[in-house]
Amino acid sequence: MGISSNGYSDDLGWNWRFGVWNQELTQTKSGYKGDHYQGEFASRLARTAWYDEASGGRGYIHLALSSSFGVPDGNSPTNNQARYRTRPEARTDSRWLDTGRIAGADRNSVFGFESVVNVGGFSWTSEYLQTKVERQPAFGPNVTFKGLYTQFAYVLTGEHHPWDRKTGTLGRLKPFENFFMVRDCDGCRQKGMGAWEVAFRYSHEDLNDDKEVTENNG
């Protein structure tokens, strides 16, 4: 449950969104533990620094900052807990990285930076996130985790990834031709290559904190 707002500037150069929520109870989902009130504030400010109108948006640069602040607000005898775990992009069965339970989580915050550069069929996307868990003094020092990814891609068949300047998000790539053999609106079979793209992606996540937490490999 919550309330949020979003908007964009008249020239579509800026867009933003922010909101306040009462986070869902997550005791059974390996998240924060506590009573029903778990407030969170989240925001994102994005800038389309360049957009090539002449080519229909085949070139653009996007930059954005994001943040969120949460208060688990647990109650005795169940002390607040936090846990961070994840799978790789291949979506393996097990989660490769897992902090385990972090006791005494009093507040949490996330700060992020993201960027997208697109020129024709070439695109470069990247994002960096830093998460801090503030703990009750009796349970130990605060802990910080970091993660990032960067990806280079090229569309071999000439399409591009469109950009939505009102929301600051990537749109769906639309192939120039349907793939292989499909029927058109007249019922005739048409041949096409579809859309083909090659990509290289590097991602890194550090769920260790020298002061307290050592990640568990699944």
Which role does the model predict for each range below?
Residues G59, S67, S76-G218:
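Outer-membrane beta-barrel pore domains
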Residues M1-A46, W50-S55, D73-A105, D184-C185:
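Surface-exposed coil loops of outer-membrane beta-barrel proteins
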Residues F18-V20, G59-V71:
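Extended catalytic-interface subdomain
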